[in-house]
Amino acid sequence: MRRFLISSVAVLALCAAAPAVMAQTAAPVAASPQAQSEDARLDAFFEQAFQARIALSPQQMTSLGIKTDYDKLDDVSDAAAARSLALQEAQLAQMKAEFDPSKLSTRSKMSWRLFEYGVQQARLSNQWRDWNFQFAANGNPTTSLPVFLINNHRISSVPDAEAYVSRITEAERYMGQVATTLKARAAEGVVSPRFVFAPSIENTRGVITGAPFDNGADNPVWADFQKKVGALDADQATKDLSLIHI
């Protein structure tokens, strides 16, 4: 309670001081030409770093509207996680080697610190990666893939439809990596709570029920694929061929 009261007083004090602080900082100080040049270089570096990072994640690129590696799913192995962290560490080292914070504007100094903080957080996240529960009552890897395909994989051409099918095929490799990770964690005693099992099994079973798996209503992924292919600007024979391939 004492700590709560002290924190509350501190927040009130900051709120009271906010108008004065805003008044003092209302007029931004123009960055020097040198700082502007360094800012531009740093912005270009951040853009290159971002592009290099998302190149490791076909699914993230798809979510951003980029169709590179449109027929692939993410690599979710421990080795892939290590590669991602190694890339971020290398980018941080490159930034520190190529840029002098004292030559940057206030805005870019903040961006510098945020980039550094992001790598630090990635480092911690990777350190405790094995303690993460992959299965929860409200979702798991088996249900996230159908949701991803339905919500993010757009089909505006026959190659897009073929990429959709390729991703369904890729699911076997993807789930194999998930299974390998789960087994390794279980061997170390890291297992989701028992109450998660029943809803997870039920939700996962829903992924492989319905047509074309049985005589029920269309499976959500199958229904989504038919709808998207049906909307293609192509002749019916081409559409039918795409549907046969799934």
Task: Outline where the language-model segments fall.
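Gram-negative bacterial Sec-dependent N-terminal signal peptides
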Residues: 2-22
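N-terminal maturation segment of proteins
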Residues: 23-245
